[in-house]
Amino acid sequence: MLDVDLSGAWRTIATVGRIMVTQRSGSIVNVASTAGLVGYRHFAGYVAAKHGLVGLTKAVALDYAPNGVRVNALCPGSVRDSSEYEGRMLAEIARSLGVGVDEHESVFVQAQPTNKLVEPGEVAAAARWLASDDARGVTGAVVTVDGGFTAR
């Protein structure tokens, strides 16, 4: 978990960051998670990796800012997704909590102040904005797209 979600991000940032620093412009958007902001039972490795990614984002943003390179983190919450991967992940989470998949999804929905899961397009729109020139004054930020989950 740490090797892919944290070390992989570090290696990618180091590689593309050198190019962006040389050209004195660029935007890196790291996809973390609300697990990078709060803890979740039964997922210590994932939580550690995502907290690390948030910290890495802030540190690298400070390093790269003088060279015109922006680095931000996007922290999605519970996202509605019908992919095979998401199905397996939901099943694993449900099993760890001792509930069925349908019951698990309703628990996630009830935990959202908006009473709905985040849509994939909402996360994509935030990533697109962070990468765009419209966000040229934003670096070192942690942007949540979580239906208000972390506002509590």
Where do the language-model regions lie?
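Catalytic Tyr-X3-Lys loop
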Residues: M1-R11, S25, V29, L53
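The catalytic Tyr-X3-Lys active-site helix of short-chain dehydrogenase/reductase
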Residues: G8, G39, A44-G52
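C-terminal substrate-recognition "lid" of short-chain dehydrogenase/reductases
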Residues: W10-I13, G17, V21, T114-V145, ...
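Active-site helix of classical SDR
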Residues: I13, A49, T57
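Residue(s) in the substrate-gating loop at a strand-loop-helix junction
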Residues: S33
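Active-site loop immediately N-terminal to the catalytic Tyr-X3-Lys motif
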Residues: V38-A44, P66-N67, N115, D133
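Short, small/polar-rich loop/turn modules that mediate ligand/substrate recognition or access, typified
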Residues: A65, R70, V138-G140
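A glycine/serine/threonine-rich, flexible loop-to-helix segment
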Residues: R80-A111, E122
